[in-house]
Amino acid sequence: MNKTDLLQRIVQALEHDMDLLQRAAQTAYEAATAPENIAENKYDTLGLEASYLATGQARRAAEIRQALLAYQQLALRDYDPARGIQVSNLVVLEDLQGQQRLLFLGPEGAGLKIGEGPAQVTVITPRAPLGQALLGKRVDDEVSLVLAGVTQVHVVIFAQ
């Protein structure tokens, strides 16, 4: 998958998530403000719970909006061996067992998965431990992470 197509698919996925979340937030807001959900006693908390849900969904929608804006403004850069891996690079890592992972180092949207099977791309950001470890690395460099007391070693086998 080329990076231009990948960027377009990331934007589409974020737009889809944004649409779903806006509808869910609107539904929760309507539930929170509905006359039938006004508390009749101190144990009647349906309206309060709905307002907490609406607030959380609105906060998540703002995060997705920020990610969407970041990707809409993202200038894709080719991998430059002199600079190493940077934001907007597509990277293939291989672990010691030969398992490969396809990663896109993006500005936002960590955890987003695009595609399926061996061609699935996972979005990571520089704020994540793996993203931090990748910044500045080059093809054939080793990347080591300690997660939950276990050292994970990967080799950068491709960067674009």
Predicted regions and their residues:
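N-terminal intrinsically disordered, low-complexity, charge/repeat-rich segments that act as generic
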Residues: 1-82
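Short, charged beta-turn/beta-strand-edge "cap" motif at the junction between a beta-strand
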Residues: 97-98, 144-160
